[in-house]
Amino acid sequence: MKRTLSILKPDVISRNITGKVNAYIEAAGLQIIAMKQLHLTRIQAEAFYVVHKDRFFFNDLVNFMTSAPVIVQVLSGDDAVHRYRKLMGDTDPKKAAKGTIRGDFAESIDANCVHGSDSEENAKNEIAFFFSRCEIFDR
């Protein structure tokens, strides 16, 4: 089984739709094998999104991700990275297909509900950013 990182962003938590989003994940055949809620510090958010530090949206992204708690999760399944990216839908919810998380729940390109790793290599690094090995339980 392959793994990927999922972050349920502050808009999911504040709108109380965590269960709905996780239902989509599980219905897609992905298992949630680790999960925790935390409130990112600015330093943590900047470190996690360092790849975007020179992009115009970096400050807004960091501000949003530190505005309220998030839920970080490790998902497991065949081709987990690709399957979760497809399930998330387009970054811009106006372009996201119905039946995807962003197509059905996201309110804007900024408050777009979820983050998912974009490659297996990044998934390993992102998972290690938030979880130690003893916090992940394969089924």
From Swiss-Prot:
It is found in: Cytoplasm. GO terms for biological process: CTP biosynthetic process; GTP biosynthetic process; UTP biosynthetic process. It comes from Neorickettsia sennetsu (strain ATCC VR-367 / Miyayama) (Ehrlichia sennetsu). Homotetramer. Keywords: ATP-binding, Cytoplasm, Kinase, Magnesium, Metal-binding, Nucleotide metabolism, Nucleotide-binding, Phosphoprotein, Transferase. Its cofactor is Mg(2+). The keyword Membrane does not apply. It comes from the Bacteria. Transmembrane segments: none annotated. Its EC number is 2.7.4.6. It catalyses: a 2'-deoxyribonucleoside 5'-diphosphate + ATP = a 2'-deoxyribonucleoside 5'-triphosphate + ADP; a ribonucleoside 5'-diphosphate + ATP = a ribonucleoside 5'-triphosphate + ADP. Belongs to the NDK family. PANTHER family: NUCLEOSIDE DIPHOSPHATE KINASE, NUCLEOSIDE DIPHOSPHATE KINASE DDB_G0292928-RELATED. ATP binds at K9, F57, R85, T91, R102, N112. Its main location: cytoplasm. The keyword Hydrolase does not apply. The active site is at H115. It is an enzyme of class 2 (transferase). Gene3D superfamilies: Nucleoside diphosphate kinase-like domain. This is Nucleoside diphosphate kinase. InterPro entries: NDK-like_dom, NDK-like_dom_sf, Nucleoside_diP_kinase, Nucleoside_diP_kinase_AS. GO terms for molecular function: ATP binding; metal ion binding; nucleoside diphosphate kinase activity.
